[in-house]
Amino acid sequence: MNSLFDLTGKKAIVTGGTRGLGHGMAEGLMEAGAAVVIFGTSKKVIEVAAQFEAKGYWCKGIAVDLADDRARQEAFDQAVALLGGLDILVNAAGIQRRHPSPEFPLQDWKDVLNVNLTAPFDLCQMAAKEFLKKEQPCGKIVNIASMLSFFGGMTVPAYAASKGGVAQMTKALCNELASKGIQVNAIAPGYMDTDMNVALTDVSNPRYREITDR
């Protein structure tokens, strides 16, 4: 392992760690030496954590509904207790709803904004408070934004709004926390072949052709 990427002894929480980008990011942190607690919406997260541990990594899984304020706090506190502290938070969990904008259900809008924007902000606050408790405050927060933070996409107004919010929230937190030793950054991936994007990777979907023909 290149020493530039050595995270031996570091302690991390990764939301959305059972699949997709969150799963890959969690494994990347573990490959670099970090101990990781992954959050997932179902008991499958326990199985995934066990699979990581079978590879020789330190990993624990916590099932949590990130839309639930109290459950978020309880899961965070449990993770910090398991890890014995916290150095890194990766907000990778997200949900998607697809409807033409004129018919987009308001409840779907609320659900997406809650999981994709409110939950990450809440967890950022929790992590920042934990980092500031240290004798020498420090820590790293990585929020997963999207190319749709900058381009609106099609039939996904709630997702685009949530990821635009993540990008701006990240800038705001960075402005406040950088001087306190806390780094806050965002990654904005393009289209990825994950469960969230199965509607786009179906070759029979006209949207697939619109994207790949560019």
Q: Can you annotate each of these PLM segments?
A:
Residues 124, 162, 170:
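Active-site helix of classical SDR
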Residues 129, 175-179:
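Alpha-helical segment proximal to the catalytic Tyr-Lys
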